[in-house]
Amino acid sequence: NYYKKLFGSGTTLVVT
């Protein structure tokens, strides 16, 4: 599992 910060949108994509 890892969390990748989506720059520009300011949201976080959570991939398990």
From Swiss-Prot:
Keywords tagged on the record: Adaptive immunity, Cell membrane, Immunity, Membrane, Receptor, T cell receptor
Highest rank taxon of the organism: Eukaryota
GO biological process annotation, one example: adaptive immune response
One Gene Ontology cellular component: T cell receptor complex
Localization, UniProt: Cell membrane
Cytoplasm is among the record's keywords: no
Subunit structure: Gamma-delta TR is a heterodimer composed of a gamma and delta chain; disulfide-linked. The gamma-delta TR is associated with the transmembrane signaling CD3 coreceptor proteins following the stoichiometry: a single gamma-delta TR heterodimer associates with one CD3D-CD3E heterodimer, one CD3G-CD3E heterodimer and one CD247 homodimer forming a stable octameric structure. Upon activation, gamma-delta TR complex associates with FCER1G to initiate intracellular signaling.
Function, in words: J region of the variable domain of T cell receptor (TR) gamma chain that participates in the antigen recognition. Gamma-delta TRs recognize a variety of self and foreign non-peptide antigens frequently expressed at the epithelial boundaries between the host and external environment, including endogenous lipids presented by MH-like protein CD1D and phosphoantigens presented by butyrophilin-like molecule BTN3A1. Upon antigen recognition induces rapid, innate-like immune responses involved in pathogen clearance and tissue repair.
Record-given protein name: T cell receptor gamma joining 1
Organism this protein belongs to: Homo sapiens
Name of the gene: TRGJ1
